[in-house]
Amino acid sequence: MPDSRAAPQESLLDASLGTTQENVGTSSLTDGQTLSKEPLSHALKLSTPEKVKDAQLNPPEEALWTTRADGRVRLRIDPICSQTPRTVHQMFSTTLDKYGDLSAMGFKRQGTWEHISYTQYYLLARKAAKGFLKLGLERAHSVAILAFNSPEWFFSAVGAVFGGGIITGIYTTSSPEACQYIAYDCRANIIVVDTQKQLEKILKIWKHLPHLKAVVIYREAPPMRMPSVYTMEELMELGNEVPEEALDVIINAQKPNQCCALVYTSGTTGNPKGVMLSQDNITWTARYGSQAGDIQPAEIQQEVVVSYLPLSHIAAQIYDLWTGIQWGAQVCFAEPDALKGSLVNTLREVEPTSHMGVPRVWEKIMEQIQEVAAQSGFIWRKMLLWAMSVTLEQNLTCPSSDLKPFTTRLADYLVLAKVRQALGFAKCQKNFYGAAPMTAETQHFFLGLNIRLYAGYGLSETSGPHFMSSPYNYRLYSSGKVVPGCQVKLVNEDAEGIGEICLWGRTIFMGYLNMEDKTCEAIDAEGWLHTGDTGRLDADGFLYITGRLKELIITAGGENVPPVPIEEAVKTELPIIRNAMLIGDQRKFLSMLLTLKCTLDPDTFEPTDNLTEQAVEFCQRVGSKATTVSEVVGKKDEAVYQAIEEGIQRVNMNAAARPYHIQKWAILEKDFSISGGELGPTMKLKRLAVLEKYKDVIDSFYQEQKSKQGSSLPGFSLRWQTGASS
């Protein structure tokens, strides 16, 4: 190792550790493919029944929550959820026994797909764990990962847990300041990065991170030799210096009710909160939450999954990483530019059996299909519209019927099967979405392609899914049924049966790291998690989300107005609208901010000025020649504004009462985005940020207008221009 580096610190290891020699390749992944199986047979001793019994619950006096990284909690074992708790290592050991020779991960190297088996995956995780220990990983401290999805992300995460640490993901889009907050809060001993860009962020803030001992970089080489900065290959070499027995001692001491993962919320209302997840949270949810979604074990059918959503978010982490281990799935990694356009190429090559996307991803796929259709020949376009029309009608009228009419089967054979194949969904049996609401328009579009989108509902605080839809539990617009073994209750229900959703079960998190007040707000005295979301349950137990308590608008007149149903109604009525945000808290009436559907820059994923094909078609239907946002907004296109006003009036006509009417609105010059601050990492609307950013526009809605002069479009009551009431 370079002499300029500080010597790695040892913490959980005895200072007199010996060394063992193993085969060392030229890269961390090649290394995993050539490792001897001798350490594996040694490690498997830990998965015997005697070791499983060792992982027992702690005494019953332990509380249901803690805010300490080294704390333990009482597991929520009861008659309906009595499964034996397991650690992550025990889960992986069972997988090795069943699926050791199966492909665990697929990744592209120089244009060619390569694979890592579960045996190789396990050995890589052990070597990473020993490397982390050699670098000074302390118990209940973190290994933070600031990188795009990759095999290194996976075996570093598992290795961190094996080594007694806590895995903490950081969004790759995070600023240095955001990285500093998380790395400091989680007491990161080691940070793993994939590029020089991410390394530079850490170098800027290192002096503010007293617990940080080393950085590991793997996709790109560091620009120069630097103290305490290692490549992944060097980390693995350091792991050779730690005996297998030393790692076994650490693994064997782990308990299911200890923290092994931290998931940081997006911080829409302040600093991000570190959601502490126990080993039992992870292993129970990976098994039973995925079963509720009909994920299959590899002995029945090996699931194939494309990993591309941020692993720092609980949805991707539980679905890609932990569920993959539980059932022996093959996880194939997309390119880092997946969300900039390459995802479909990966889907075509991999042909996944199940797939998950946030609503914006599904919307982007929908827009791409619409653009291709608009540029296709007349006959093909008409055939596609016919096929989607008859298929949508069938799926809406007989959603559970396996007996399809001849016309529906013909439409699928002639048209829709080809579309699904072009998307990479020829073999995909389960398509999931979560993390944000999905419009009825998007759901109908994919039903027209004979693609059901199965919703799940959960939070970081529920380790991911607490409700799941599946081919056997599906109802349009619902979030599915509660995962067997979990519980739900609605509190403070109104006359329509809508109340706050409260949850209980093995999915419920340990607590917020270092935030006792926030933890007590979330978990009541009886141990129920108060989600802050509102919803209703139908007679069959399907959950329908109606909004959030914190988002509930209380007008100056005392009317309680949930914004989401009104926003969704506007987007359904006006297909040119991408984002709609209702305003009116403590105001005399409701108003709304709108953005138009525009294309995204393929390199930056930023909104452009160009309208999508669907938006252009809308303009043409209403008599406008506009093709850009600036033509509509900058020139106040009369035809488009009139059409939007009429659409909003139609929404108002269907409102329950006049206080629910949208009285004023404005179209913003640019669509919402992550970089603009209006959207979170999963494209969820950050309402407080929008209120602050567009404060002047909003205030203009409620200023008393002294004169109506200056209106270029009489008859609009200046609703959309200056905020004057009609």
From Swiss-Prot:
It catalyses: a long-chain fatty acid + ATP + CoA = a long-chain fatty acyl-CoA + AMP + diphosphate; (E)-hexadec-2-enoate + ATP + CoA = (2E)-hexadecenoyl-CoA + AMP + diphosphate; hexadecanoate + ATP + CoA = hexadecanoyl-CoA + AMP + diphosphate. Catalyzes the conversion of fatty acids such as long-chain and very long-chain fatty acids to their active form acyl-CoAs for both synthesis of cellular lipids, and degradation via beta-oxidation. Can activate diverse saturated, monosaturated and polyunsaturated fatty acids. It is an enzyme of class 6 (ligase). The modification Phosphotyrosine is found at Y641. The modification Phosphoserine is found at S36. This is Long-chain-fatty-acid--CoA ligase ACSBG1. Gene3D superfamilies: N-terminal domain of ligase-like. Residues 17-36 have a biased composition (Polar residues). Keywords: ATP-binding, Cell membrane, Cytoplasm, Cytoplasmic vesicle, Endoplasmic reticulum, Fatty acid metabolism, Ligase, Lipid metabolism, Membrane, Microsome, Nucleotide-binding, Phosphoprotein. One of its GO terms (cellular component) is cytoplasm. It comes from Bos taurus. It is found in: Cytoplasm; Cytoplasmic vesicle; Microsome; Endoplasmic reticulum. It comes from the Eukaryota. PROSITE patterns: AMP_BINDING. One of its GO terms (molecular function) is long-chain fatty acid-CoA ligase activity. PANTHER family: ACYL-COA SYNTHETASE BUBBLEGUM FAMILY MEMBER 1 (PTHR43272:SF93), LONG-CHAIN-FATTY-ACID--COA LIGASE (PTHR43272). Belongs to the ATP-dependent AMP-binding enzyme family. Bubblegum subfamily. Residues 1-39, 707-726 are annotated as: Disordered. One of its GO terms (biological process) is long-chain fatty acid biosynthetic process. Pfam families: AMP-binding, AMP-binding_C_3. The gene is ACSBG1. Its EC number is 6.2.1.3.
